[in-house]
């Protein structure tokens, strides 16, 4: 369950103030609904069928993007190197209405299946089966029927999807729930709509995955250390790759070359992400300073939009690039982002996935 009251994250989500306190009664009601849904699930009132293979859920408790998709890509590639046969499911955010699960390929339409699934297919060269549908359990059924060799499923988001049956590792199972957390943290720690949280910050998880540095507030107050004391957490290093031209992927330049070639005032960075500032900050760390145009997540692009941007060089994300296949503008350069999984994380992940199926030993 989520709210779409705000096109982009309001500032009062970051710190408690008059507006967030005024909206707090609605957040309390939202929390009550969450607890009721959890109770129904825990009591087994709604029957769900266990999945025959382990499930890795890469989700977040804060609305908006926190960097889940690069993690899904990195997980699939690393697990494949280790001998696993991953499959991927996604809701397909930003997609048009669907009546049945759909198989995603690198040439699928983002408007039909969503931005992230197409990006995953492109970055993995269609190596893994990817299925999208809001009802994730049906996606799993379609995936396993189409690709019975799959022995582990990665879900891009889905923490709040109660219909996605799981037996988490922390309870002795072999399914894994990851909460991805970026530099914004939990903001004012209120639930929607007074704050940015889909679920309480204290939500159980098997591990927290950090994709950014702690916010200034957390460094100053020490809340971060107190909250994560005794919890399993991993810091995942992210880095920007070598940009390539949108109309000619073989034409590449380093960010340093681009920064030397164009003056800052003649360059513009554009990002339609849940947290576009992260892209801009990553560029700045590489010495690229330019004008910034932040857009809402899943923003749509047209030739007319880019024509209005007066710049000699336009830098966009790979997620945005999948929606620009029909655009021919030599000024546009795509900046890929990759992610490194530390070995201690991979070893822990392996130890969980290799557990025996707990469903076989229950009466």
UniProtKB/Swiss-Prot annotation:
GO cellular component: plasma membrane
Keyword Kinase: yes
Disulfide bonds: none
Class of enzymatic activity (EC top level): transferase
Binding site for ATP: 62-69
Regions that span the bilayer: none
Catalytic activity: a lipid A disaccharide + ATP = a lipid IVA + ADP + H(+)
Superkingdom of this protein's organism: Bacteria
GO molecular function, one term: ATP binding
Pfam families: LpxK
GO biological process per UniProt: lipid A biosynthetic process; lipopolysaccharide core region biosynthetic process
Annotated EC: 2.7.1.130
Pathway: Glycolipid biosynthesis; lipid IV(A) biosynthesis; lipid IV(A) from (3R)-3-hydroxytetradecanoyl-[acyl-carrier-protein] and UDP-N-acetyl-alpha-D-glucosamine: step 6/6
Cross-referenced SUPFAM superfamilies: P-loop containing nucleoside triphosphate hydrolases
InterPro entries to which the protein is assigned, alphabetical: LpxK, P-loop_NTPase
Keywords: ATP-binding, Kinase, Lipid A biosynthesis, Lipid biosynthesis, Lipid metabolism, Nucleotide-binding, Transferase
Keyword Cell membrane: no
Role, per record: Transfers the gamma-phosphate of ATP to the 4'-position of a tetraacyldisaccharide 1-phosphate intermediate (termed DS-1-P) to form tetraacyldisaccharide 1,4'-bis-phosphate (lipid IVA).
Family: Belongs to the LpxK family.
HAMAP family: LpxK
Name by which UniProt lists this protein: Tetraacyldisaccharide 4'-kinase
């Amino acid at each position: 369950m989520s709210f779409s009251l705000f096109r982009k994250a309001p500032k009062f989500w970051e710190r408690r103030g008059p507006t967030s306190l005024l909206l707090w009664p609605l957040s309390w009601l939202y929390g009550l609904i969450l607890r009721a849904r959890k109770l129904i699930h825990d009591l087994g009132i709604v029957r769900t069928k266990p999945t025959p293979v382990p499930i890795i859920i890469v989700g977040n408790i804060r609305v908006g993007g926190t960097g889940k998709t690069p993690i899904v890509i990195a997980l699939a590639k690393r697990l494949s190197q280790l001998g696993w046969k991953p499959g991927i499911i996604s809701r397909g955010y930003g997609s048009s209405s669907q009546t049945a699960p759909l198989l995603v390929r690198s040439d699928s339409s983002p408007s039909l299946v969503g931005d992230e699934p197409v990006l995953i297919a492109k970055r993995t060269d269609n190596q893994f089966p990817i299925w999208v549908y809001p009802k994730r359990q049906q996606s799993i059924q379609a995936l396993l029927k189409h690709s019975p060799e799959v022995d582990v499923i990665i879900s891009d988001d889905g923490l709040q999807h109660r219909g996605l049956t799981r037996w988490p590792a922390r309870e002795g199972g072999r399914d894994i729930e990851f909460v991805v957390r970026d530099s914004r943290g939990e903001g004012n720690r209120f639930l929607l709509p007074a704050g940015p949280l889909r679920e309480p910050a204290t939500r159980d998880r098997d591990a927290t995955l950090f994709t950014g540095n702690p916010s200034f507030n957390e460094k100053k107050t020490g809340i971060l250390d107190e909250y994560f004391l005794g919890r399993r957490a991993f810091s995942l290093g992210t880095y920007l790759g070598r940009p390539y031209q949108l109309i000619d992927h073989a034409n590449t330049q380093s960010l340093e070359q681009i920064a030397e070639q164009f003056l800052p005032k003649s360059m513009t960075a554009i990002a339609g992400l849940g947290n576009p500032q992260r892209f801009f900050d990553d560029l700045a760390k590489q010495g690229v300073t330019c004008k910034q145009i932040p857009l809402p997540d899943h923003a749509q692009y047209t030739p007319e939009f880019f024509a209005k941007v007066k710049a000699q060089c336009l830098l966009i994300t790979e997620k945005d690039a999948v929606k620009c296949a029909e655009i021919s503008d030599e000024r546009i350069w795509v900046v890929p982002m990759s992610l490194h999984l530390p070995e201690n994380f991979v070893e822990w992940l392996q130890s969980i996935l290799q557990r025996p199926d707990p469903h076989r030993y229950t009466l």
